[in-house]
């Protein structure tokens, strides 16, 4: 999803772009509040993303090295500048009483991001995964457990009590086009949809709602998306993605044909800036055609 957001920012005025990001992966660690999904979007939009696909380019890891020397079990690797970013978020929360949305807006202003990166809620929601090893928070499952084991359960703890921020609802209601990015439907998008009011806002929105399939050439390029879809008894294909989103969608963009709803069949790999911009333009063109 972050790559496509960057492509969108390259073909439209970034100030017109709002990205609603999952906070179910958030974690409190090293005395800081780490918010991986919103930060990933921000770093992509600022052209600061490292070639590994996470963290800041040319970041150093002196703090992690220092913690190891002190006997700390460092299982979540965070660069020095990345940690500074997260510590500043925590400071703004505790000292200035800023919520996640306002704090991230302040951080993004400092790195020149003009798009609106919006945490899905001001309230805490955490994704937990169950395998044969028991229940784990998302980051522990992904990193410490290396996403090993068959997924037996998925919970978005706190979602029922959470509410979408005013900024999220306003972005949905005022959008000309709504795109669900090619992220893991179960792990990255479902936590957003689990916040009461967001699914309903998407259904009621006047703009067309499209999804870009994360399945490319019959495979998932990144992460354990296939394992999550298997847990939900979904086919790992664009049809499976369409089945998961159901009534939310007016159309889907994929590199394979989808029979159940209007589809744009095109290449969806985003290996470079040109490919990201091309896909963004195609998605927007498809949305415009659907809106007629």
Question: Which stretches of residues belong to each language-model region?
Answer:
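An anion/phosphate-binding loop that grips the pyrophosphate of nucleotide cofactors and donors
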Residues: 175-176
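Short connector loops at secondary-structure junctions
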Residues: 212-224
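C-terminal functional extensions of proteins
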Residues: 221-292
